[in-house]
Amino acid sequence: MQSSSPSQNHSTQVPIKVTHRQVKKRAIRRRRVDLVCGCSYYLHINCFNHGFTHRGSHHCSSSNEWRVYLGNKQSPVFHNHQAPTTTIPAEPGHHNSPGSIQSQPEEGAGDSQMFSQLPDLDNLTASDWSFLKGL
């Protein structure tokens, strides 16, 4: 049966497997961010306004930390790192002092706070156990 279209050049759809294979081979778009301490990290190009603390300093992935890489000696990799003039203040309620170590509570053999209100576990029925296992 002949096509009713006057055009002889019909495009065929690319199979989805071929498309997926091409996308997987594509380089992940990410940016390199150099920190004052000399460390660097890579950030996905669509990820922004997320922060973290590293060596006692809070870092936010905002546009202030991006650097343009020009290659050779123009690249910031070859420049001396200087401390930033402005810092992001720590949010209230967070304890970000670099020298403090938070102690962990000691383990004990007593009742935990979560299970102190439960009745004796020997009194649980089979339906109670099946309900708990389903959680």
Swiss-Prot record:
Keywords: Activator, DNA-binding, Host cytoplasm, Host nucleus, Host-virus interaction, Inhibition of host innate immune response by virus, Metal-binding, Phosphoprotein, Suppressor of RNA silencing, Viral immunoevasion, Zinc, Zinc-finger
Region entry Disordered, spans: 77-117
Pfam families for this protein: Gemini_AL2 (PF01440)
Region spans: Transactivation: 120-135
Zn-finger (unnamed) residues: 37-54
One Gene Ontology term, aspect cellular component: viral capsid
Domain of life: Viruses
Gene Ontology molecular functions: DNA binding; structural molecule activity; zinc ion binding
Metal-binding among keywords: yes
Transmembrane segments: none
InterPro entries documented for this protein: Gemini_AL2
Residues in the signal sequence: none
Function statement: Strong activator of the late viral genes promoters. Enhances the expression of the capsid protein and nuclear shuttle protein. Acts as a suppressor of RNA-mediated gene silencing, also known as post-transcriptional gene silencing (PTGS), a mechanism of plant viral defense that limits the accumulation of viral RNAs. Suppresses the host RNA silencing by inhibiting adenosine kinase 2 (ADK2), a kinase involved in a general methylation pathway.
Name of protein: Transcriptional activator protein
Taxonomic classification: Viruses, Monodnaviria, Shotokuvirae, Cressdnaviricota, Repensiviricetes
